[in-house]
Amino acid sequence: MRKTFLAITCASLLSPTFYSQAQEVSADETVVVTANRFKQIDGAVLAQTVTVTKEDIKRLQANSLFDVFRTLPSVEVAQYGGRGQSASIYVRGGSSSQVLVLVDGVRMPRAIMGGIDFNQFPINSVERIDYIRGARASIYGSEAISGVINIITRAPINDDSGRVSAGYGSNNHKKGTFVVSKPVGEGKHFKGVLGYEKTDGFNVKPQPGLNDGDEHGFETLNLKLGYQQNFSDNLSGYVGVSAYNNEYDYDNSSIWSGHEKKTGEVEYVGTDLSLEYNKDVYSSELKLAYGQQDNYDHKSGQNKSTGDHVAIEQFNAIWLNSYSVNEELSIGGGLDYRTEKLAKGYIAPSDRGPAKDYDPEKNPRTNFGVSAIAQYAYDVWTLEASVRNDDNNQFGNNTTWQTAAGWSFYEGYELTLSHGTAFRAPSFVDLYYPGYEMPNLKPEESENTELSLSGAVSIVDWTVTGYYNEIENMLIWEGAGMQNVGEAEIKGVELEVKLDTDIVSHEFYLDYKDPVDKSGAEDTQLAYRSKRGAKWNAYATFDQWTLGSQYLYQGERFNGSTRLPSYSLWNFTASYAVNQNWDINAKLSNAFDKDYEMYVGYVTPGRQYFVSADYRF
């Protein structure tokens, strides 16, 4: 995994001034798309970020986004069992609904509860993952309280590759992928991905005498198609279509209702279209995207029509612009329109009936955002400021802002300081759960301050960051429904170190935080967040071999008065290049068969193996 100062974008807009600079920089410098929505040299970026490349994903031998995210700094992940089960991500102590997840710069349709279940998204189409920490609502709007993750599936227009892979592992885990990414003429490119995966799984929530012998498996079929074309030196376009159909089993047994095994199905279809214009000192992009996610819930073995059905529709229109005033000053701005609605079904299980005062056909949720940013770089100083206003038909106006400064006080060393505000809009369930409707809820709000020092000494690149995040109006369940009565305070320190020792590349991540829930009479630790974490990723390449290891330490966590002990995990990977076309791969996860819990009452995978073969063409 390559650590950079890379930030995230909703789209790939080019600042010509920085582009011309990029032609002259050395190979060690990187031209990146930043949180400012235009391209910059990495040294000009002030946000703390990491990029995961397609090559990194291959070295990890990741079968899911869960496998990737758990290796990132200041990230805690948890899932209700094994592959395909519902999963959550906690960035710097924030909740899953307080991190914004994008796909090719566009928001994923939100789950009914407001968070994104990234365990349902197929990893086989991913080209790169950009991960930024800290408040970015002044650029992106709602949910960007603790961080932003941009999952990029669009291939470079000059990419010429193809791959067929097949693998088998523990719990009868089978996986096959076909990928073609090829130029189809001058300035034209096509990418197609087809994938299938199935595992029998295991009993993720054993209840003796109720569900003995149950297995909770996962199955997915997914497709991704993309075409891009350069119409001229200045104008290019892209159109993409993606779809996946997932099924996962889970346990719904109880001592009151007896044994009940259920199946959840997730069907997603989305399409996006974009046009980019770049000329001299001006760049512009228009992007349109539509997605629908259907969620079915029914008893296992029965047809999906016999259970509950919920569908979320989302449409996005984004127009971004950037202008280089001179070599020191660049400005940018954007308009974002989004509409989302509950297209079918109920917000809650159908036996609760419809919510009061909510007709999804007559009252979709719409949001219009206007943002502006400026960055000034001169001598050893870099300054930036951004502001955004979101006008939402449910909760009204919300204005966020951020300022940052960077001081390169000595060659190879930089000190950065930033302060910004952020918010999260209530979800459909927060507002309209039948019998507990609270249509007047306000957004959660936060203020984040962070100070970073980075340096490069010989073979070592390092960064240490301290942050302080206050969150108010947190949505907490009270007897009558959700209420804006919660408050949290999260303080933390991160250390990132990257170095190469002979043939081995290392990445070390340490974090200490104090995630405090201040909502009650006494301060408590936020649920399922630990205070301490450590990660080590290492890879060695020699001859035809690539060997890897990943170490993860997770500190103790709490859910109310229940304590979940700390744990350590080791994963090992090996890949052998038979020739230029064939690779043989093997992975051993949880190598020492550690017994641990992510959620109370749910079993995690023990020692697991997975072997695969790749053919490249």
Swiss-Prot record:
GO terms for cellular component: cell outer membrane; pore complex. Residues 40-154 form the TBDR plug domain. Keywords: Cell outer membrane, Ion transport, Membrane, Porin, Signal, TonB box, Transmembrane, Transmembrane beta strand, Transport. It is found in: Cell outer membrane. A motif (TonB box) lies at residues 29-36. It is a multi-pass membrane protein. Residues 1-22 form the signal peptide. GO terms for molecular function: ABC-type vitamin B12 transporter activity; porin activity. It comes from the Bacteria. CDD domains: ligand_gated_channel (cd01347). Residues 159-617 form the TBDR beta-barrel domain. A motif (TonB C-terminal box) lies at residues 600-617. PANTHER family: COLICIN I RECEPTOR-RELATED (PTHR30069:SF53), TONB-DEPENDENT OUTER MEMBRANE RECEPTOR (PTHR30069). HAMAP family: BtuB (MF_01531). Belongs to the TonB-dependent receptor family. BtuB (TC 1.B.14.3.1) subfamily. This is Vitamin B12 transporter BtuB. It comes from Vibrio campbellii (strain ATCC BAA-1116). The gene is btuB.
